[in-house]
Amino acid sequence: MEKQVYITEEERAKCQKVADAFAELYEMENIMVIDAGRYGFVELKYYKPPHGFEDAITFTDSVALFEELWEEWLNTKLYLMAKGTTLLEKGYKGVFESLPEDKQSELIVRKVDFAKIAEIYM
């Protein structure tokens, strides 16, 4: 019986570049991305001992993985900036909009940086 493959080798290589590009995210948050072989790449989130990760999302498309990890990275950064303040009540969008324009630009430029590292062309 032939096993079904859910991700091409080309896309698997691209997903690995994306996962590697966001290495700093894994240090900031309880998130990791693993290569699950023929199934694609799996984002594991919110580790809670003794049961493990609460959320697992499988990706077979490098652009979708990139966008997911970008959102996680940005939201984590915004949370860390607003932690301990009333800004968090505004949600991530509100926190972002309350930042000075230069800080907003700095965060947005990081998306371009991640895309270059991951070789994702948007």
Residue spans for each PLM region:
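Acidic, low-complexity, intrinsically disordered interaction modules
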Residues: D35-F114
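Short intrinsically disordered terminal tails
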Residues: M1-Q4, A118-M122
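Negatively charged, low-complexity tracts enriched in Asp/Glu with abundant Ser/Thr
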Residues: E2-E29
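Generic secondary-structure transition motif, activating predominantly at the C-termini of alpha-helices
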Residues: A23-Y26, W73, Y121-M122
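Broad, structure-driven detector of short, well-ordered beta-strand segments within folded domains
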Residues: N30-I34
